[in-house]
A protein has these predicted regions:
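Extended, low-polarity transmembrane helix blocks
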Residues: 1-42, 60-68, 72-165
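Short juxtamembrane and helix-loop transition motifs at transmembrane-helix boundaries
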Residues: 45-57
Length: 165
């Protein structure tokens, strides 16, 4: 039970005294996840169509779930609320994205359209195509470890809770 309490505190009561520049990373990651989530609903080829081509089970449900997660989670990151908690599914999502799309690209077996600029397959194609995946993965990894920073709703709520004691 003690470990569960520690995990709860670590996820939902993160340190809020980190560098102010954490705000920039939160805004970048939150903005990218939010816009990518919206795109999954606006453009079928980015949502259901993409998950269908990749062979995901229940592509409509998967696209709806992932798109909804990205919209809600992106808004949470932008606000700096539950930052560590939402970073966990985002880390998992980005690892799955890299494994399901970029390994096949490397091997030249991707069901998705090839990148518009050479090279089309192999190491350098993967390096080009994974740039945003890596940026998102490393950003939410940072936020998972560092917390939301002092300019966040988590910091305001933490300060309010301390004043209320």
């Amino acid at each position: 039970m003690k470990r569960i309490d520690e995990l709860y505190r670590w996820l939902l009561r993160p340190p809020t005294d980190g560098p102010a520049a954490t705000l920039l990373l939160r805004l970048m990651a939150g903005g990218v996840f939010l816009s990518e989530g919206i795109l999954k609903f606006v453009y079928a080829n980015q949502g259901v169509g993409r998950f269908t081509k990749l062979g995901f089970p229940w592509p409509a449900a998967t696209a709806t779930f992932v798109g909804g997660l990205e919209i809600a989670g992106g808004l949470l990151l932008l606000a700096g609320l539950c930052t560590r908690l939402i970073a966990v599914p985002f880390v998992i999502e980005m690892i799955v994205a890299i494994l399901t799309t970029k390994v096949a690209l490397y091997l030249g077996t991707s069901p998705l359209p090839l990148p518009p600029a050479p090279p089309k397959v192999g190491f350098w194609a993967v390096m080009h195509e994974t740039r945003s995946d890596w940026a998102q993965l490393l950003t939410v990894g940072f936020l998972l470890l560092a917390g939301p920073g002092r300019w966040s709703l988590d910091a305001r709520l933490s300060a309010s809770a301390k004043r209320g004691r």
